[in-house]
Amino acid sequence: MPRGLQAELKQKIPFTSREAEAYLSLLRTADALQTQVEAKLKLFGLTGTQYNALRILRGAGPEGLPCREIGERMITRDPDITRLLDRLEDRGFVQRTRAKHDRRVIYGKITADGLKLLREMDVPLEKFGREMLRHVGQEKLKQLIELLELVRAGKAFHRRDAESAE
């Protein structure tokens, strides 16, 4: 009798390998989490990538970051940082300026309105994140973090980063 992911997917044939099962399990879990997070963010009028960019800029401090670096720090790579920042700038959450040392470099920085929005979101999203993973327990969460870091340390991730930099 199928169990776990095999049962969830109503798959009669077992997975061809543990790697295949783990890979599909990661994708399924990430999709489920992302769907719920996106619904929560929608209540604040943001997408996941917009929220990620705002958090990056908040963490960067008042000087902001070059647009290229914002793109490098994104959780989900967004090839069009310019358009992402356009949307956030149109809403008054981000401001862009040219670097004094090199006019070709554009910096993005979070505005007071962007900081205010994030402050409004902090408590509900922190609570939401805890609720989503509370059942796992602290020790298992620590193990999960270590396992995910191990997966990201693999060759395929370094190849992806190298390819996206080209």
Task: Report the location of each language-model feature.
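Short, low-complexity, charge-dense intrinsically disordered segments
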Residues: 159-166
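Charged, amphipathic alpha-helical coiled-coil/dimerization segments
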Residues: 86-146
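Short amphipathic alpha-helical segments with heptad-repeat character
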Residues: 23, 27, 31, 75, ...
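N-terminal helix-turn-helix DNA-binding core of bacterial DNA-binding proteins
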Residues: 27, 31, 35-77
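DNA-binding alpha-helical recognition surfaces that contact promoter or target DNA
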Residues: 55, 83, 146
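Canonical helix-turn-helix DNA-binding module
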Residues: 48, 62-107
